[in-house]
Amino acid sequence: VRFVVRLLFLACLAATVLVPAGAAADRMWVGFHDDPMFRWDGTRLDALDRARANNATILRTIVDWTKVAPTRPAQATDPFDPAYQFGDVDEFVRNAQQRGTEVLITLWGTPSWANGGQKPQAMPTSLADFQDFARAVASRYSGRYAGYPYVRFFTIWNESNLATFLVPQFNASGKIVSPANYAKLAKAGIAGIKAGNRSAQIGIGETSSNGRDKKSAGTDTVAPATFMKGVAANMKGVKFDAWAQHPYPFPVNQKPTQLVRYPNVTLMSFPRFEKDLDAAFKRKNVPIWITEYGNETKPGEPKGVTEAQQAAYIPQAIGLARKDPRVQMFVWFVMQDSQGSLWQSGIYRQDASPKRAQPVFAKTAKPLSPVNGKMTVRGGTKNPKITVYLREYCANNPAGATVGYTIRSYLKSKLVAVSQGAAPLGLDCTVKPRVAKLTVAKKKTYRVTVTANTATTAEVLRTITIVGA
């Protein structure tokens, strides 16, 4: 039986996610995008276990509107309209939650009933249809319905600067039109997602690393920085949480430190791109989500890198992202090579045997988990409030369940404060206690351990770093 936890939902609307502190991204969500392995393969539970064992804290998935809504829903904003087919998405989100992993949902693809019988890349005839779909998805995974986990992160469309995913890119006279069209999609998607879950975080863009900015033989493409500026010109005043970018090396045998001609955007282009991003949207420090990145390997990709090179490039790529304080997310595409796939960038081969990159990825990702977060507070702050992620608790506890905790604060190795208490488990699978009896001194760093438990779940330990500014 579905039910709505209305009071708790209202209490969680103002909840904020713990933001990494410092001059670098000391914490960021690191994980994989691999729908074939995580959603459809017969070994998907094992694949998800391996993702978690590799210290993934986030898993991206594409929710294809054409597959979820092959026919027009009678009540499109109702997340449980009989026309919707969410079966494998529901299973994936539940399986991720059981493993303590966050989910990023990317909405993409227009059903033929919504665009006059055209392909999924074509714009919907009515943007209200996309807005209604976005609302239904965000509502279904808002945490308000028992058995349907809370999803924190959403992005709108996929590689929208490529005609492979969004058409048209140019009009008949050769003028670039895709940024203005995408801005319409983004505004409709944001409105829908926020109507379904006001605390959701939303990324826009989802741009590929390169494009040509003019019609030519082959697929029409627009360079990501050109595309971004066009989107910004058509989205004045619209709020969003991050720009999502796929800074793949190109050609595929290039290393993470590759330099490319701007307005193409790879990892080394970020300083210039971020300056333009702020100027275009008239904001400061717009966050970046890297929602796809990878290095394909030989022999599956003849033009790819060796497995040894892939292993060497992973810490370089994540290291470049980590040095950038704006980067909040790094998603590797894919976890495992699979039969029939065009991509050979997995850290596992098709037979599930690990490539040399596998232990390197696990080691590199481990210290970056936001679950063991880092925050900066003003010196002199008493009893600072912290956010404790307890995603796995939502698998066996309803929102509002009492979470007991013991908090210990250390200055170097010295125990300086101990407190105990209880707090309700939020719809977003966090608790937000205060670190009682602690006064944060300026220029001091504290290690705060939180031991938490509920009546039905095992004890877990989280470690939060608090820096006095």
Residue ranges and their predicted role:
Residues 459-466:
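Edge beta-strands of extracellular beta-sandwich domains
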Residues 143-144, 160, 165, 298-316, ...:
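Aromatic-rich peripheral "rim/lid" segments of glycoside hydrolase catalytic domains that contact
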Residues 415-429:
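Solvent-exposed serine/threonine-rich low-complexity stretches and specific carbohydrate-binding patches
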Residues 451-455:
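Beta-strand-rich extracellular modules
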Residues 24-57, 62:
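Boundary/entry segment of secreted carbohydrate-active catalytic domains
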Residues 15-23:
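C-terminal segment of classical bacterial N-terminal signal peptides
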Residues 41-44, 131-152, 173-308:
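Noncatalytic carbohydrate-binding groove/subsite architecture in carbohydrate-active enzymes
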Residues 54-217, 250, 298:
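Substrate-binding cleft and catalytic face of glycoside hydrolase catalytic domains
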